[in-house]
């Protein structure tokens, strides 16, 4: 089990750090009183491997409970529980700027100067920082860069590469464009099986319909160009911090062309090792005569 304790200065980026760890599959708890760490650790270790990665945020908000941190860490060590400390730091100037921009009060100086609170906090956290396994100074890091730093330390390579979850979604324009779409492609320019008597009753999931749609040169050119564009977009979306991508492909009713094309794109992405799901939102709507969808 990997047990990470996240701490550091207020305003240094602990919230973003815990979100990044959560994206990496860590079970995360924010602001757990240090006195509860031993019992929490015991409970997690007793799950028999169901919980493999844990991250706790411990900070000055814990008040007097924070003083119990070292006793809890001593207990963990004596009981053989391995843990790591991640310390988030930043310069006084940057912290002051962040507090002013957020209009938040410093927890150790709610009615006084921000700098005084920062100084008090630095003194209280000095020993924790000295014990830290990893220290990240966020003074000059953008959110994306902090996420990358977290990934480099705590992420597994195959997990990082497949962290963007892709959903390929077919739909019918007559029922509305899916509201959560990131990319929308209109395939109503392709030959329509709906007007072929022996194909109308089937869907794009059926081989005879799929073969018909994919038999045209225009279809193959479109699929190839779309795949090339996705090969370019996906790593750049990931680089900018996107963790979910919804690719919506629409035709008139969402039963024939969009389904066949969505399946082709899904198979192509899957063959390249992406974590990808497929959903045909309106495949049965022409049968049920449903209304507008989200």
Swiss-Prot record:
Domain of life of the organism encoding this protein: Bacteria
Molecular functions (GO terms): ATP binding; GTP binding
Binding-site list for GTP: 59-62
Binding site for ATP: 8-15
Signal peptide per UniProt: none
Alphabetical keyword list: ATP-binding, GTP-binding, Nucleotide-binding
Annotated function: Displays ATPase and GTPase activities.
Family, as annotated: Belongs to the RapZ-like family.
UniProt cross-references to HAMAP family, sorted A to Z: RapZ_like (MF_00636)
The protein's name: Nucleotide-binding protein CLK_2809
Organism: Clostridium botulinum (strain Loch Maree / Type A3)
């Amino acid at each position: 089990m990997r047990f990470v304790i996240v701490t550091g200065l207020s305003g240094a980026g602990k919230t973003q750090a815990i979100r990044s760890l959560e994206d990496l599959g860590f079970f995360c708890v924010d602001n757990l009183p240090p006195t509860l760490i031993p019992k929490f650790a015991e409970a997690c270790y007793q799950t028999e491997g169901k919980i493999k990665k844990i991250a706790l945020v411990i900070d000055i908000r814990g008040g007097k409970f924070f003083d119990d941190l070292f006793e809890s860490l001593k207990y963990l060590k004596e009981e053989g529980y391995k843990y790591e400390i991640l310390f988030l730091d930043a310069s006084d100037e940057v912290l002051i700027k962040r507090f002013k921009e957020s209009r938040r009060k410093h927890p150790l100086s709610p009615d006084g100067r921000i700098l005084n609170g920062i100084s008090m906090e630095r003194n209280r956290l000095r020993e924790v920082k000295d014990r830290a396994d990893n220290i990240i100074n966020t003074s000059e890091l953008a959110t994306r860069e902090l996420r990358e730093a977290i990934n480099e330390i705590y992420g597994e390579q195959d997990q990082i590469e497949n962290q963007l979850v892709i959903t390929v979604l077919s739909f019918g324009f007559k029922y509305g464009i899916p509201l959560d779409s990131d990319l929308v492609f209109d395939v109503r320019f392709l030959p329509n099986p709906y007007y072929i008597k022996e194909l109308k009753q089937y869907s794009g999931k059926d081989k005879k319909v799929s073969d018909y749609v994919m038999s045209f040169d225009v279809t193959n050119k479109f699929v190839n160009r779309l795949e090339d564009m996705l090969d370019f977009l996906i790593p750049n979306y990931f680089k900018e911090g996107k963790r979910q991508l919804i690719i919506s492909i629409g035709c008139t009713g969402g039963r024939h062309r969009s389904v066949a094309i969505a399946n082709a794109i899904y198979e192509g992405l899957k063959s390249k090792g992406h974590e990808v799901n497929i959903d045909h939102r309106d495949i049965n709507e022409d049968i049920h005569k449903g209304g507008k969808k989200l």
